[in-house]
C-alpha cells in the first residue's frame, strides 16, 4: 500500500506474469548467445594454424630438452670436466636464475614492441651462443658466468612468451586442452633428456653436454621459424607490476 498527500491508501500491484515472461525471454537469449559463442570457439583449427601449433609444440620439446640437460647434468659436468669441487657449480646456476628473475619485466616490455615470436627466437639465439661458448672452456673461468647470465635472459625470453603463443593459437573453448598439451610436451622433454643425455655422457664423454644442448636448440630454432600464428603483440601494460600477471 501507498499513502498519498490526503492520507488515502492505494494498493500497488505488480504485473508478475509480464515480468516473468520478460525474464524468461532474456534467459533464453543469453543461452542462445552462449551456445553460439561455444560453437564458434570450439571449431577445429584450420590446417595452417594446426601446423603452427605442432611446430611450436616441437620447439617446446626441443628447448626443454636442451635447457634441462644442462641444468640436471651441469653439477657432474663441472666436477668431471672443469674440476670444480665443493659445490662451486651452484654459483653458475644461481647466476642464471637471478638473471632470469631480473629479465622478466624488461622482456615483457620488449615483447610488446617486437612480438612474442621474435623474442623467443632471440632467447634461443642467446642460449645457443651460451652453450656453444661453454663447450670451448677446457677449465672453469669466471667469464663462464657471463654465458650463464645470457642463459638466464634467454630462458626468460622463452618462458614469458611460449605459453601465451599457445593460448593465442588455440580457440577459446580449447584453452584448457592445449595448455595441457603444452605441459605434456615440456614434461616429456624433461623426462627424456636426462636419460638420453646421461647415456651419451656415460658412453662417450661428459663434454657431450653442451654440444647436445646446441643441437636441440638449433632444432628448436628451425621449428620456431615455421610458426606463423600466435604472434600478435601483447597489449601494453599500464603499470610495471602488471608484467608479473600470468596469462593462463
Question: What are the residue ranges of the model-derived segments?
Answer:
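Hydrophobic core of transmembrane alpha-helices in multi-pass small-molecule transporters
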Residues: 143-157
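Helix-to-loop junctions at the C-terminal end of transmembrane segments
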Residues: 103-116, 201
